[in-house]
Amino acid sequence: MCKKRNAEINAEFDIIKKYCIYIGNIPFFASKNDVVVKFAEYGETCNIYMQSNKPHCDVKPAIVRYRSRKSVDKSLCLNNSKFGNTILIVLPLSLPYSRYLLTYDTCIVVYINDKNSCKTSMAELYDEFQKIGDIQNMFKTTNNMIYINFESEKSMQLSLATKPFLINNNIFKIKKVERNINMCGLNSESQDFSTNLKKKLLYNRSIGIFGLPSNATEERIAQIFSRFGDIQKITLICDVVGNSKQYGFIYYKKRTSANAAKVIMDGENFEGNKISVRFVPEKKVFKN
């Protein structure tokens, strides 16, 4: 049964990968909500997975799932953009593994050893090395090691000729990379993502209910939706004077409960109104 269920999850994940983007080099201080707000500009998001901060590294990766494939294409303009003091990696999750590799013939590694109080950020490194040649991607593995992948081998060779490199009175050691580097920070070996990660992207514990009658109450919503499992929080959205905006959010204790509620209640009648039920980012439930 477990193998069959895992096969189902893998099949479902292969479908939704087309709606997902991989984001690398997110600042350690950024929350899920910060990422959702930044990327929601390009379309409605329905889920997010973010890895916790790693030791000795002030950036982290995430995956955002959109409702539309068009949103994936639009969001790619944020690749190599600044987010705080870092430079983002933004790529479609559906790319083959080889597209996540920084190729050795166009890539250098920069070793950072800040000797004074003026630290050097990824954004500052990007601005300096961009003067040498167009940068395809940057990937930070630790606070002291950043890979820079140029568009051309010529730019890579020119960057090596600049050493020793000086920014903020800090000297940087630059070396040529001897092998391809995987810049997908979720798995150092491949894109064979864990079953747990897949579940988090396929199903979350939050659903949005849209098209509710204007007189709907949180108590009535709880009566109808509690049959799918334990509810941790219900938020009915109202305007400044307290009138219902006719939608709300439910946060379940288990993802299976949220999934059952979505499958069964989407398109059903709620006291005279046909409602729409869909997954929403979990942070949205508490944003009130």
Swiss-Prot record:
Tell me what gene encodes this: Nix
Q: What happens when the gene is disrupted?
A: Feminized males, which display features such as the absence of one or both gonocoxites and gonostyli, or antennae with fewer and shorter setae than normal males. Mosquitoes shifts the alternative splicing of dsx and fru toward their female isoforms.
Gene3D superfamilies listed in its UniProt record: 3.30.70.330
The function of this protein is:
Male determiner protein (M-factor) that controls male somatic sexual differentiation. Acts as a dominant factor that regulates the mRNA splicing of doublesex (dsx) or fruitless (fru) transcripts and promotes expression of male splice forms of dsx and fru.
GO aspect biological process, one term: cell differentiation
**Name the UniProt record assigns to this protein:** Male determiner protein Nix
Name the UniProt key words of this record, in alphabetical order: Differentiation, mRNA processing, mRNA splicing, Repeat, RNA-binding, Sexual differentiation
Q: Repeat among the record's keywords?
A: yes
> Which PANTHER family does the entry mention?
GLYCINE-RICH RNA-BINDING PROTEIN 4, MITOCHONDRIAL ISOFORM X1 (PTHR45880:SF2), RNA-BINDING MOTIF PROTEIN, X-LINKED 2 (PTHR45880)
**A cellular component term, taken from the record's GO annotations:** precatalytic spliceosome
Q: A Gene Ontology molecular-function term?
A: RNA binding
Q: Which residues form the RRM domain?
A: 19-94, 108-179, 205-282
* Superkingdom, taxonomy of origin: Eukaryota
The record's listing under InterPro entries reads: Nucleotide-bd_a/b_plait_sf, RBD_domain_sf, RNA_proc/Spliceosome_comp, RRM_dom
